[in-house]
Amino acid sequence: AAFEVSSGLTPEIVEKISEEKHDPEWMRIFRLKALETYNKMPVQNWGPSIAGLDMSNIVTYVRPNTEMRGKWSEVPDDIKNPFERLGIPQAERASLAGVGAQYDSEVVYHNVKAEVAAQGVVYTDMESALTGPYAEMVRKHFMKLVPPTDHKFAALHGAVWSGGSFVYVPAG
């Protein structure tokens, strides 16, 4: 791994994740508030028992030793091979408007077909959207559908999220 936080779930670890990901200040604060919410909420009683889950032994963020690529041919083979076995690149070429590949907690590949992009559709990784021209849109809508206050694990996600895709489809 190129970077890994210590095990556990503390404000210091969440701050380190935010720093490593070059979050804007509002996201750093969002993460810390989500952690506060996580620490205050009880574990849900739906689903299987997770009584033995000990967050002090879990590493919540690991960045692999790679970076995002613009072309599938540039993605390292050890990352690309599982996707090739699943037939994802072929499916992308055949019918998908766009595809992204995430390895561990980082997006390593994103691509959108030119004809879709020409219509104003944006498909990129969350980190680029968070700090680029769509930053205000991300800020306005991030975790609004399932907010950190929804349940304990939504709060956990809000504190330590990484990776993911941003899609914008203009009206019309």
Feature names for model-found ranges:
Residues A1-G172:
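Glycine-rich and polybasic anion-binding loops at the starts of cofactor/ligand-binding domains
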